[in-house]
């Protein structure tokens, strides 16, 4: 498949226009579909669907706190897991625009304490494209049993024990360590914590007041609790996420994520070069990966033969799931945040897209889930 480019993001009117669907009818169908998932799959979380710059459905479902019977609200805060990687990639590009970072420079320039073979062979480009050869996870004991915050120095120490599984640049292989390292670089060149940089460059300027970086000493007041399904019902399933620096430690609301999406896809926040880097993906074998986003084709609404460009990322971690999908040509954004696992979040997200475009979910959406 040819590379999908950011140039498509400016092409909102390609091909025949899809048939219009009344907004109130769409909202009713979206809500009914979500309630079916609540009943049959135990979905709990918050959802926002926006079309042509207007929110057409925004609602919360299920419980945020099983013990206290506190319901999820539209302003509930959820851990977003690997959707954090998209924020890290954007922050790197902001620093590139400022002349602070060079995507092709060896990491040793920024992290002199990184093991020599890693520092000399890895670049930010390879990290963001998931082509470093680093393993998927940091350390199972750290990820599952840490009761106190893991420091950046400790994360770097653990990365220095990692072995490469292939020559850097040889192929695509998804790894959380890539984005741990990118966050460490951000901290090194700014002299500030990852949380402080995100606040200064994204959360503050975009007025994302319900978003931030979670730590043991910073658990947000409106956060939903994460749960795992079991034979006897659901049970709390959470962990200290400080180990997930730059790859899974952000919490947010659906409203804040929509604000962020509007800035990203509105063509005004980042330079054209940055958008090209972020939103140019590869082949399916390369994970459709750009910089912190997956870019792949999608099927549009009735009467439109051309396939559109989907920009997406999701997350899955203890008790939480997330998806942010932006269907470029249809100017459609679907955001799903959940606080129970396992749950078929990708299927639900694609089905919500179908309904918003006036298509009944079925074989088309199932095929896109598998793509």
Regions found by a protein language model. Name each.
Residues 17-59, 146, 187-192, 196-200, ...:
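Catalytic loop of the DD-peptidase/beta-lactamase superfamily, centered on the K-T-G motif
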Residues 25, 29-33, 82, 87, ...:
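Extracytoplasmic/secreted proteins, especially bacterial periplasmic and envelope-associated proteins
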Residues 79-83, 95-139, 161-163, 184, ...:
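Active-site helix/loop module of the DD-peptidase/beta-lactamase fold
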Residues 60, 75, 138-220, 242-258:
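Catalytic-site signature segments of enzymes, centered on catalytic residues
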Residues 19, 63-65, 106-113, 140-145, ...:
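Short linear capping/connector segments at secondary-structure termini
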Residues 36-46, 67-129, 164-177, 245-248, ...:
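Short active-site loop at a secondary-structure junction
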Residues 2-12:
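Bacterial N-terminal signal peptides
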Residues 60-68, 153-157, 226-233:
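Acidic-glycine-rich active-site phosphate/pyrophosphate-binding loop
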């Amino acid at each position: 498949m040819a590379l999908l480019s950011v140039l498509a993001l400016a092409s909102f009117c390609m091909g025949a226009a899809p048939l219009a669907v009344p907004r109130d009818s769409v909202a009713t169908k979206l809500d009914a579909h979500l309630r079916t998932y609540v009943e049959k799959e135990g979905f709990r979380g918050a959802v926002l669907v926006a079309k042509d710059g207007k929110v057409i459905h925004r609602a919360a479902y299920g419980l945020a706190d099983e013990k206290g019977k506190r319901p999820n609200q539209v302003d509930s805060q959820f851990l977003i897991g690997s959707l954090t990687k998209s924020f890290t990639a954007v922050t790197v590009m902001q620093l590139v625009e400022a002349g602070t970072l060079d995507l092709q420079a060896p990491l040793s320039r920024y992290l002199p304490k990184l093991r020599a073979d890693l520092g000399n062979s890895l670049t930010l480009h390879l990290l963001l494209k998931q082509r470093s050869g680093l393993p998927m996870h940091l350390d199972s004991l750290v990820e599952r049993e840490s009761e106190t915050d893991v420091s950046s120095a400790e994360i770097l120490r653990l990365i220095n024990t990692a072995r490469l599984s292939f020559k850097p640049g040889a192929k695509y292989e998804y790894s959380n360590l890539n984005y741990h390292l990118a966050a460490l670089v951000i901290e090194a060149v700014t002299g500030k914590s990852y949380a402080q940089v995100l606040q200064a460059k994204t959360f503050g300027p975009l007025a994302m007041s319900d978003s931030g970086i979670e730590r043991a000493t910073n658990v947000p007041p409106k956060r939903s609790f994460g749960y795992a399904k079991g034979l006897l019902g659901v049970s709390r399933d959470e962990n200290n996420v400080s180990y997930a620096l730059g790859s899974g430690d952000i919490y947010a609301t659906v409203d804040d994520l929509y604000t962020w999406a509007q800035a990203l896809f509105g063509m005004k926040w980042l330079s054209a070069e940055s958008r090209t880097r972020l939103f140019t993906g590869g082949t399916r074998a390369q994970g459709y990966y750009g910089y912190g986003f997956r870019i792949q084709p999608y099927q549009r609404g009735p009467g439109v033969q051309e396939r559109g460009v989907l920009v997406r990322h999701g997350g899955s971690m203890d008790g939480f799931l997330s998806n942010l999908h932006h269907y470029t040509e249809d100017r459609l954004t679907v955001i799903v945040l959940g606080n129970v696992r396992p749950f078929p979040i990708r299927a639900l997200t694609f089905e919500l897209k179908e309904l918003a475009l006036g298509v009944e979910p079925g074989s088309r959406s199932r095929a896109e889930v598998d793509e």
